[in-house]
Amino acid sequence: MRIGILGGTFDPIHYGHIRPAMEVKASLKLDKILLMPNHIPPHKNTTHSSTAQRLEMVAQVCEALTGFELCDIEAKRDSPSYTVVTLKQLSRLYPDDELFFIMGMDSFIHLQSWHKWQQLFELANIVVCQRPGWHLAEGHPMQHELNVRHATLEALSHSSAPQHGRIFTVDISPQDISSTQIRSLLAMGEIPQDALLPVTLNYIQKQRLYFS
């Protein structure tokens, strides 16, 4: 089974997370995608809703969408959400499956700053979502990794046994949505209906999240 993994703060989860995940799922013919809320993101000091509330929002999205599942292993962890630790745990949970860790190009270009980043390739494939405006500069350290590890979608269709260590690039539709924008709109009393799944908007309104 091919399993995609998309981690994030999801504060709140919105179409800017979901639509690219759907496009990756379709492009790589993934069987399912795990949506994985962070508990203590290493690069962020705080969140605007509780871990329990973010878990519930993601759980409701997964109930509404086919092929998406909540993964709460990072949310249950008391230590920072380092990806290498998470992938080791997921490799034990899914020993016979092929893991695809999904990230944006904006994250990929900083991958060398991640904790034990080189071990990621021993545990999973990396899927880089290409967005307008982000390009690797000539001579960028990650350009070498991309050159060596890049795999085509055609190669994926011919592989049967689970593999890891490959980098797939997937062109995604531009998403002009961010959690920060959504929180700002809600704080001003505006309802960003086009940015959120109905179940998420309903939960936010019931819980009075992000409203000033």
Swiss-Prot record:
Keyword entries, A-Z: ATP-binding, NAD, Nucleotide-binding, Nucleotidyltransferase, Pyridine nucleotide biosynthesis, Transferase
CDD domains: NMNAT
Record InterPro entries: Cyt_trans-like, NadD/NMNAT, Rossmann-like_a/b/a_fold
UniProt catalytic activity: nicotinate beta-D-ribonucleotide + ATP + H(+) = deamido-NAD(+) + diphosphate
Gene Ontology BP annotations: NAD biosynthetic process
Gene3D superfamilies: HUPs (3.40.50.620)
Keyword ATP-binding: yes
The enzyme's E.C. designation: 2.7.7.18
Pathway: Cofactor biosynthesis; NAD(+) biosynthesis; deamido-NAD(+) from nicotinate D-ribonucleotide: step 1/1
GO MF terms, alphabetically ordered: ATP binding; nicotinate-nucleotide adenylyltransferase activity
Covalent S-S links between cysteines: none
Enzyme class per UniProt: transferase
Record's keyword annotation contains Translocase: no
Pfam families (alphabetical): CTP_transf_like
Assigned protein family: Belongs to the NadD family.
Protein name in the entry: Probable nicotinate-nucleotide adenylyltransferase
Organism: Shewanella sp. (strain MR-7)
